[in-house]
Amino acid sequence: MGVKDILSRKTGVIVGDDVLRLFQHAQEKVFAIPAINVTSSSTVVAALEAARDKNSPIILQVSQGGAAFFAGKGVPNGKQEASVAGAIAAAHYIRSIAPSYGIPVVLHTDHCAKKLLPWLDGMLDADECYFKLHNEPLFSSHMIDLSEESVEWNIETTAKYLKRAAPMKQWLEMEIGITGGEEDGVNNESVDNNSLYTQPEDIYTIYKTLSAISPYFSIAAGFGNVHGVYKPGNVRLHPELLSKHQAYVKEKTGSSKNKPVYLVFHGGSGSTKAEFKEAISYGVVKVNLDTDLQYAYLSGVRDFVLKKKDYLMSAVGNPEGEDKPNKKYFDPRVWIREGEKTMSARVQEAFDDFNTSNQL
């Protein structure tokens, strides 16, 4: 049985119970869905092509900075207005184009720290407006990241937002335990290493609190994760901690499931296949990738420019003749497409690494 056999909506953006079914199926079949950060229609297309070609479900997500870029750098963002508008624009674009690729897509928003809560509020306003018209939220899910705050305030505030999302059957991802490194303007490179590891007791408290509100939630637990890419050996991941979290929650709740918690792997760029495989075996259903894909996109553009540099120095004139036009080389559709190709190839690798290929 494949993913499409269990979903009520087979292609395009899925919501509510379909998201829950997808994550349940992922745990049962021991695979995780790549969560790809997108910042433009071009990166959306690259990711969707990879999922189609690998016959796989995919998660597309926009960060606060990525959403602002989607809106345009000329739009003011002092009150998160560009990030709200850009996220909504990305959502409508993805909803419009995703069915053409014949795959199920989870439409998600990435890290929302305390200072960015107005961004989340604005998107939830849009979700509720969309829900009134279509009986489903605009976004499949959101991510609230209050891991830098006290555990108590983190859980209390996350619960408040889950209560708002629950009537729409909207998924909410939360983070406990800081992910190191730097991403999208949030810098945790100097945090104490002990802060990178979540305790089982905290996972249970979160699970108990949130499950009383809604089943539509997942937890990004810290097990040494770091955003960005670093030299081998500089990042010490301990995926085995995730197994302890599952066992502790199972014991405390008396659950019949060996993996009662839907877990998320943040800071996936640069991790080894073995680390991915082990984490997924402990109930990770979503793995975030961003930095690797940024570099993959660049590599296609870079290689094209270096290879064709003699055709890119002027609009007219190249090694074939001083009157020869170069439009077919400098047309943005040409070199942007090269970036899409290399990014798509890297996303395809992720489907293989996470055992997601041919799961539809």
Swiss-Prot record:
Top-level taxon of the source organism: Eukaryota
Catalytic residues identified in the record: 110
Pathway it works in: Carbohydrate degradation; glycolysis; D-glyceraldehyde 3-phosphate and glycerone phosphate from D-glucose: step 4/4
Binding site for Zn(2+) 1: 111, 227, 266
Annotated InterPro entries: Aldolase_TIM, FBA_II, Fruct_bisP_bact
Sequence positions that bind D-glyceraldehyde 3-phosphate: 63
Positions bound to dihydroxyacetone phosphate: 228, 267-269
Cofactor(s) listed in the protein's UniProt record: Zn(2+)
Uppermost EC category: lyase
Enzyme Commission number: 4.1.2.13
Expression induction: Preferentially expressed in yeast cells, the host parasitic phase.
Reaction(s) the record says it catalyses: beta-D-fructose 1,6-bisphosphate = D-glyceraldehyde 3-phosphate + dihydroxyacetone phosphate
Statement: the UniProt record of this protein carries the keyword Lyase: yes
Gene Ontology terms describing biological process: gluconeogenesis; glycolytic process
Annotated cofactor note: Binds 2 Zn(2+) ions per subunit. One is catalytic and the other provides a structural contribution.
GO cellular component: cytosol
Family: Belongs to the class II fructose-bisphosphate aldolase family.
Entry function: Catalyzes the aldol condensation of dihydroxyacetone phosphate (DHAP or glycerone-phosphate) with glyceraldehyde 3-phosphate (G3P) to form fructose 1,6-bisphosphate (FBP) in gluconeogenesis and the reverse reaction in glycolysis.
Oligomer and partners: Homodimer.
Protein name per UniProt: Fructose-bisphosphate aldolase 1
Source species taxonomy: Eukaryota, Fungi, Dikarya, Ascomycota, Pezizomycotina
Encoding gene (name): FBA1
